[in-house]
Amino acid sequence: MRDPEKLKEEMDERNRKILDVAFELFVDKKIEAVSMGDIARAADVGRATLFRYYPSKLELVIAVCADQWKRYLDGLDARRPISSVHDIPAIDRLIFTMDSYIDMYQNHKALLKYNDNFNYYVTHEGKNNDQLVDFHSSLSVSYTHLRAHET
């Protein structure tokens, strides 16, 4: 019998690889042009394994977007803890916000490109909002966390 902790660690590593590879492919080729088979090959996992993690391409696309935004916001929070933003004067908050936008443009162009591609894909695939509920709620949690520290 396999060690449950080791198994979970392997699954987490495989999931991380899938998300990272999918992000790279989606940015390089656009979401529409990338198949689940392309992702499975590039991530060196079987198609069945990929579909066990993400039963549909839309679920993977949403997971990639949520993961990338979480990583970006975590990095931003590491540079200046979001909880400390409310402790600074309004002008410094404005500077922090502008610096964040500039940093994103200069250092996170792939995320911006992916985000634009994500919006187009979701809009033009005719997906209904029910399929995006988890994604919107994850963004809502991040947004609420940020807004809670502005006042």
Question: What annotation goes with each model-predicted range?
Answer:
Residues 144-151:
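Conserved small/polar residues in nucleotide/adenosyl-binding loops
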Residues 66-72:
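Short, basic, alpha-helical segments at the C-terminal edge of helix-turn-helix-like DNA-binding modules
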Residues 63, 77-107:
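Hydrophobic alpha-helical connector segments
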Residues 102-141:
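Short secondary-structure transition hinges
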